[in-house]
Amino acid sequence: MAYLQPADYPNYGLPTGTTADWITSATALINSYCRRPDLNVIQYTERLRLTSGVQTVRLSYLPLAPLGTGSTPLVSIEGRYGRPRRGEILNEPLMEIAWAFSLPGQWTALDPNSVDYDPNTGELTLPWNVMGLPYNEVSVMYTAGLATVGDDVKSACAQIVRNAQSTPALNASKTKIDTMQMQYFSSSLVDETVQAWLRPYVANRLG
């Protein structure tokens, strides 16, 4: 979905005659820069390794937000006990018990309501197992994005269009602007101002 609608053009300094292809291409460029398929709320799945002795992980896509009428952005979570790597065993007798019951390698469903999360940082704090065993890997299905596209994203979209329209190689073309053309000039179109507006939405890692 495009981040600017025709009714928005006057408010963000774009001529009313701006065609949809400019907005569509600018929207695609924003998604590419933020390393995510969309800034609207959609579902993601990540598999993450936990640091030894720590029961927290950080998700890539922010902000965490429920989809539609959902009450939580956490759809499902599974934790797994794996054989620790060298230097990771904190309680060797406890791990020996776990191995005796064949726990390593098994995925266990966690109640999403038992997991604390920060919607702005994407940090999850996992509960401990009843035996006191830490998980060392989790698979998280969650939703993240903007329920309402804000002024920062709309301003970024408009600025990219203005930058593109002032780029001679793009503006001189009489054909429709497409995403590939915009990507070629992305280093100049996504200027420092645009980067500042989009910084909160850039994925923490490549997805």
Predicted regions and their residues:
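Divalent metal-cofactor coordination and adjacent catalytic microenvironments
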Residues: 1-207
